[in-house]
């Protein structure tokens, strides 16, 4: 946006989809209703500096227990956990946390950024739209204010699409998002707040109240589809 003299700084390592972060994010996002407790438990353990967690699967349906166990095993095989052990008789999964900062960051919210990034990239590619996409973009305004945007796309010949990702409390950030949208000079439909905490009705209500677009994991793809088709 040269008219507004806004400068964007990219870190290309953050959009490298050759690792397993994007696949893991997609699994967590698509099965979020089932995996939310696992994510919360891991986040809590990191915050409290606990080295491990136990997941008791005995009170779940066989299908759900199997899905969670399989996910944990897959995440372990891709080094998201340092150790994985399933105690079959007790139906307990024992997980030792990985100390690598990139993995901790992933569980603390990075997975949602990856999920939104991949969703946006997929929508653009499916429609053959040339666009630059990036995660964690530092944006410098003319007065040298620095802001970081979680996910941004610059579709050719169109205004930017910004997605801010919140896997926890987001209400205190609404005012910041409103100011940011105005400074970027983009339509409310193109400034998206993606949160795991809202159902469709709540997201629609907040979208009506504020000049922003609120979505959840289920409605993100649908909203992006309407933007990319436009």
Question: For the regions a protein language model found, what residue spans apply to each?
Answer:
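Intrinsically disordered, low-complexity Ser/Thr/Pro/Gly-rich regulatory segments
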Residues: 1-230
């Amino acid at each position: 946006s040269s008219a507004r003299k806004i400068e964007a700084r990219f870190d290309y390592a953050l959009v490298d989809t050759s690792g397993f972060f994007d696949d893991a994010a997609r699994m967590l996002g698509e099965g979020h209703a089932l995996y939310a407790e696992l994510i919360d438990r891991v986040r809590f353990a990191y915050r409290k500096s606990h080295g491990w967690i136990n997941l008791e699967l005995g009170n779940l349906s066989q299908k759900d227990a199997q899905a969670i166990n399989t996910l944990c095993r897959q995440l372990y095989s891709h080094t998201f956990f340092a150790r994985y052990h399933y105690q079959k008789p007790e139906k307990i999964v024992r997980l030792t946390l990985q100390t690598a900062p990139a993995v901790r960051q992933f569980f603390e919210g990075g997975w949602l950024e990856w999920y939104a990034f991949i969703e946006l990239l997929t929508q653009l590619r499916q429609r053959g739209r040339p666009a630059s996409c990036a995660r964690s973009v530092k944006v410098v305004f003319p007065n040298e204010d620095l802001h970081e945007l979680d996910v941004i796309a610059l579709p050719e010949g169109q205004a930017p699409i910004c997605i801010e990702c919140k896997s926890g409390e987001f209400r205190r950030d609404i005012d910041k998002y409103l100011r940011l949208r105005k400074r970027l000079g983009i339509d409310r439909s193109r400034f998206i707040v993606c949160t795991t905490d809202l159902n469709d009705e709540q997201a629609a209500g907040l979208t009506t109240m504020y000049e922003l677009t609120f979505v959840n994991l289920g409605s993100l793809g649908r909203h992006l589809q309407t933007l990319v088709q436009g």
